[in-house]
C-alpha cells in the first residue's frame, strides 16, 4: 500500500536499513513532519537530484547524475495533416519525430535539445524548435504545406536523462 499526501513539499530524504524517511512541509499550514517508509520512490522528474538522500550511496553529490533535455511539442488542427492515428518520422538529423491525431488536433514532437538552465528555469518554445519540427513534417508530408500559422499551440517540457559527458542531448 501507499499513502499519498497532497500539498506536501519534500525538504529532505534519508535512507536507513529499514527503508527511508522523508521530511516534508505542509504547503498550506507550514507544519513540518517526517514520514517513515519501507520504500521511497523519487518520481520528481527534472527535480530528482535535489531530493537525493543525504547519505546517498552514489558518492559525490556535486557531480550531476542527470542531464536535462528540452522537448517541444506542437499542436496543429487535425485536418492539416493526413494522419489518422500515429506516424513516426525522422527529422533531418535522424531523430524520431511523431505525429499523433487525437480529437480535433494532431500533436507533433518532439525536439531533444540540451537544457542548461536547471529545472527551476522552465524552457520556452523557440522559433528554432518550431522550424525543426515543421521541417520534419515537410520531409514526410510535403503536400500538406504546414507552416507556423498552422501551429495552434505548443509547449516545452524537461526530460531527465542519465548524464553522459561528451554526448549531445
Predicted features along the sequence, with ranges:
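Short, hydrophobic/aromatic-rich segments at coil-to-beta transitions
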Residues: 18-23, 83-85
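Core beta-strand elements of the Rossmann-like FAD/NAD(P) dinucleotide-binding domain
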Residues: 28-39, 43
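Beta-strand residues in well-ordered beta-sheet regions across diverse protein folds
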Residues: 23-25, 109
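C-terminal catalytic lobe of FAD-dependent flavoproteins
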Residues: 56-108, 113-169
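Flavin (primarily FAD) binding-site architecture
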Residues: 42-59
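A conserved short coil-to-beta-strand element within the FAD-binding core of flavoproteins
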Residues: 6-21
